[in-house]
């Protein structure tokens, strides 16, 4: 699709969203067509909710999030097939795999084992492995990534190339508030089992999160080497584990409760990261 066509599509979506109280299941014409086209483009990976720029910053295409939100107003509840044992669900968003056969799966080039759930408008690139997991609408999962058992990729989340999302990992979805950016895991990251990255936080390229690390916008990320405290972004090629910081004392002077934080225990270069096992990196 040309840039002119995308601009026209964006204009229709923006106008419809500004007047969304009038959008419902009876709405026809260019609004419905524009929303459906936007979701198809997301589903195919031809557009994405966020794109990394040359300077390393991420540009968020808010109009695509608006298209996803409008789809909830346009679509009625319906039977969704494909459950275990021929069971069904009741929802407004069909499966990405609805009406897929062998040819479609071979062309897509990824593996989806039984009980992997992907909602329509999520993009899954070639050589991705989806264990029994959940990928929500508008998400983008890039080439060579492993989405392990019971991992969740939230709505509009952006997952880079060759990422490993370990068992039970949660990558938060961000549709609202609209001004918030999606949660982003850049290329070559390792996210340890049962960890959570949410609220539009960014894990930069090559970073390693140990098991059970929780990062939201208000989580203190402490660099052990410098004492610097940051929020919302894990630096590239950093190794992060769960930790605590001393809390404020009680009014009587006794020590207060310690508070959770994420701790950067070391930073490595790209060469070291590529040659060193994850467990070895986390031992320190």
Curated annotation (Swiss-Prot):
Substrate binds at residues 111, 148. HAMAP family: DapD. Homotrimer. Belongs to the transferase hexapeptide repeat family. It catalyses: (S)-2,3,4,5-tetrahydrodipicolinate + succinyl-CoA + H2O = (S)-2-succinylamino-6-oxoheptanedioate + CoA. GO terms for cellular component: cytoplasm. PANTHER family: 2,3,4,5-TETRAHYDROPYRIDINE-2,6-DICARBOXYLATE N-ACETYLTRANSFERASE, ACETYLTRANSFERASE. Pfam families: Hexapep_2, THDPS_N_2. It is found in: Cytoplasm. One of its GO terms (biological process) is diaminopimelate biosynthetic process. This is 2,3,4,5-tetrahydropyridine-2,6-dicarboxylate N-succinyltransferase. Pathway: Amino-acid biosynthesis; L-lysine biosynthesis via DAP pathway; LL-2,6-diaminopimelate from (S)-tetrahydrodipicolinate (succinylase route): step 1/3. Its EC number is 2.3.1.117. It is an enzyme of class 2 (transferase). The keyword Ribosomal protein does not apply. It comes from Agrobacterium fabrum (strain C58 / ATCC 33970) (Agrobacterium tumefaciens (strain C58)). Keywords: Acyltransferase, Amino-acid biosynthesis, Cytoplasm, Diaminopimelate biosynthesis, Lysine biosynthesis, Repeat, Transferase. InterPro entries: DapD_Trfase_Hexpep_rpt_fam, Hexapep, Hexapep_transf_CS, THP_succinylTrfase_dom1, THP_succinylTrfase_N_sf, Trans_hexapeptide_repeat, Trimer_LpxA-like_sf. The keyword Cytoplasm applies. GO terms for molecular function: 2,3,4,5-tetrahydropyridine-2,6-dicarboxylate N-succinyltransferase activity.
